[in-house]
């Protein structure tokens, strides 16, 4: 689509359709198995219209399922706008690579870029469009529970590998290369700087430290062309990132020149309430949309309250229109208006995923990532020796790495 066609499409949308475009729902809402909608998902109280027009979907798995979800979604959408399928692909999709912390130990940009390229290929043939990676949160406290998702403590290495991952995931042209996916730099900002290493905790540092140590990784990913940025759960200078206009309007948009989509982390908009900056979901929606958060992930502050805020004059419709336009532009950059089933291919899925070539490359990168911290006559191994891998996770692919 040309940009004037996207503008016309926004003009044709009702206010409810616009607002729902800003909502991301889990794949369970589009499952043909009712039992999958359990726990918090069953308590959201969403109308069928909201489900049918929510703009993006989280966690669809497999080419066949991706095509089914996309087909039914477009049939139910009055304007036939496609959904956008996203997932966390952190260190491999089906072929598992070393964790990002180990990837940092390779000091090898080409290897990390190759990891991202293979991950994108496997994800794309399975029908996915966006990965929530790279995580470029600089971390210097080993007590933090997400250390393994970071590439380490060095700003330069962090930046170089962030850019390498973005290049690997996205390639040179997302519309023409259906075996690539859009990259989402996360978590903006300074999520890895939580006090005492406690996840979601306060981040308390000088602006100089923030700019010199923590922000360069995000900027490197953005300069490499990342299409999305995800908000962090923490506060920065006392203000939660998801409602922080200075972070997203002044720094991300104006200083860094980022023009892509900003998405909240899971439930982060509603979490503005326990942070103490919003008294209810309505105020949380107001703070987030004013800060520039385009997509709300898995809470319903936007669909429940943006229209009311608009009618009360507390927000301008241009805020909603700008967010919708950024989402539609991303869908257009991926070629979804022309090819809504982009990449999804059961035959390619069977041939590409866990291929011998991919597993061999993963093995070589794993070898590069290994660091012997203390050698007490361990090396070299003799051919007659065997190594036992034991423990509750030894056979678990879910926590491999």
Label the predicted regions:
Residues 1-401:
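Glycoside hydrolase catalytic-domain context in secreted enzymes
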């Amino acid at each position: 689509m040309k940009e004037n066609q996207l503008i016309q499409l926004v003009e044709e949308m009702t206010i409810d359709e616009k607002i729902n475009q800003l909502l991301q729902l889990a794949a369970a809402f589009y499952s043909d198995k009712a039992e999958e909608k359990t726990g918090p998902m069953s308590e959201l109280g969403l109308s069928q219209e909201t489900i049918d027009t929510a703009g993006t979907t989280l966690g669809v798995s497999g080419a066949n399922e991706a095509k089914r979800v996309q087909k039914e979604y477009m049939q139910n959408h009055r304007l036939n706008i496609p959904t956008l399928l996203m997932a966390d692909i952190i260190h491999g999709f089906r072929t598992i690579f070393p964790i990002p912390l180990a990837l940092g130990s390779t000091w090898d940009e080409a290897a990390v870029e190759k990891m991202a390229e293979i991950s994108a290929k496997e994800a794309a043939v399975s029908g996915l469009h966006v990965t929530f990676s790279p995580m470029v949160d600089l971390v210097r406290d080993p007590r933090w529970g997400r250390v393994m998702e970071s590439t380490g403590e060095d700003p330069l290495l962090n930046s170089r590998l962030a850019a390498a991952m973005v290049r690997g995931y996205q390639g040179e042209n997302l519309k023409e290369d259906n075996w690539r996916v859009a990259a989402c730099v996360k978590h903006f900002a300074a999520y890895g700087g939580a006090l005492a290493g406690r996840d979601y905790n306060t981040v308390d540092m000088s602006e100089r430290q923030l700019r010199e140590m923590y922000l360069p990784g995000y900027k490197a990913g953005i300069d490499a062309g990342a299409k999305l940025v995800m908000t962090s759960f923490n506060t920065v200078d006392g203000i939660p990132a998801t409602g922080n206009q200075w972070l997203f309007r002044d720094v991300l948009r104006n200083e860094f020149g980022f023009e892509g989509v900003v998405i909240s982390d899971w439930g982060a908009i509603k979490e503005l309430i326990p942070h103490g900056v919003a008294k209810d979901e309505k105020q949380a929606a107001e703070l987030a949309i004013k800060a520039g958060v385009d997509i709300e992930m898995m809470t319903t502050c936007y669909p429940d309250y943006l229209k009311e805020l608009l009618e009360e004059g507390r927000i301008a419709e241009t805020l909603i229109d700008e967010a919708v336009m950024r989402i539609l532009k991303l869908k257009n950059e991926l070629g979804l208006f022309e090819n809504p089933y982009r990449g999804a291919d059961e035959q390619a899925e069977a041939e590409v995923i866990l291929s011998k070539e991919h597993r061999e490359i993963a093995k070589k990168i794993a070898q590069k990532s290994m660091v012997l911290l203390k050698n007490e006559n361990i090396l070299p191994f003799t051919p007659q020796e065997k190594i036992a891998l034991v423990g509750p996770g030894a056979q678990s692919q879910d926590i491999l790495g």
